[in-house]
């Protein structure tokens, strides 16, 4: 069964076409700079990689070009071969505690959550509608970043603000990276052969968050109402005193929205180092002895260690610490700096194994009291797996209904 995993941004569209349940990637496609006459389409199969520059005014055109390209390149012979499409949606609010089949009702519910994710949900919705127009009969599913964290208890997701803010405006912690956490959790349960494993996962890419997992469920996570909360990231500040927003607004003669934009886009690595938001640039500058680069990295590592220590206490000990996503999977320096600061817990790094990049590996010594792993995440596969699961559920329900009808009519 061919299933498509879609991840859309305001000016980008990324997807994979997978053969399921074999988990085979047929093609990966990335559309960048949508909305311009210099949009870039990159298509990668097992055998080759093609790149084109095209005029693409909107997502609808992008989707049509993408699907036409699949046929022209003979990746598929007809659109009907695509039996399912899974769309990454950033915010599911409290409405969705699982991925959902896309219907008029569920799409309207997703649209109602745009206030909670004004930068992301509208772009997700545009992409969904574009695919529905081109593939109107195809089974389509929304897979939310937030659903994995809906298992958090109120004491962990509520803020100590006026309670009516939550009742009236749904102000609470929602978290992010849930699809990644779900995938990594399932991988770790298999590795440890333990369904009730207690795990702390560090998802470190340009966006960075942590999650405490107990028996396959999220107990707490570092990102909050938006992805701005938590640890410093590539361009995000992470936690700060909220009063800073008003203070800087007055001192710099900026609107609150502009200050929040600075916290989202001009802070973190970029803000402190003054160099870049890219970890590779920061690490290169650290090697050269750049003190601001060192400081930006140290601040991030310190805050990550704070969360790990807090979650260790919350879970009353852990079976494993896991690093995933771009930085977590590929930076041995990043991992070693964190693990060294956790030595008080008895965790011991195997320096040789820690050299691994982008591959699954146990990176602690045999006598380490806590196991630490590198586990590559695969959000596209996780999305496809959810589409397959919901499609099979629908098929099984149809068969059950038919059987009941047969028995009743007979």
UniProtKB/Swiss-Prot annotation:
Residues at the catalytic site: 145
Pathway: Metabolic intermediate biosynthesis; acetyl-CoA biosynthesis; acetyl-CoA from acetate: step 1/2
Cofactor(s) it depends on: Mg(2+); Mn(2+)
Binding-site positions, Mg(2+): 7, 379
Location(s) in or outside the cell: Cytoplasm
Protein name: Acetate kinase
Species assigned in the record: Aster yellows witches'-broom phytoplasma (strain AYWB)
Record's keyword annotation contains Nucleotide-binding: yes
Family per record: Belongs to the acetokinase family.
Residues binding substrate, per UniProt: 88
One of the Pfam families matching this protein, by short name: Acetate_kinase
Keywords in alphabetical order: ATP-binding, Cytoplasm, Kinase, Magnesium, Metal-binding, Nucleotide-binding, Transferase
Subunit details: Homodimer.
Chief localization: cytoplasm
Annotated EC: 2.7.2.1
Catalytic reactions of this protein: acetate + ATP = acetyl phosphate + ADP
GO biological process: acetate metabolic process; acetyl-CoA biosynthetic process
Origin organism lineage: Bacteria, Bacillati, Mycoplasmatota, Mollicutes, Acholeplasmatales
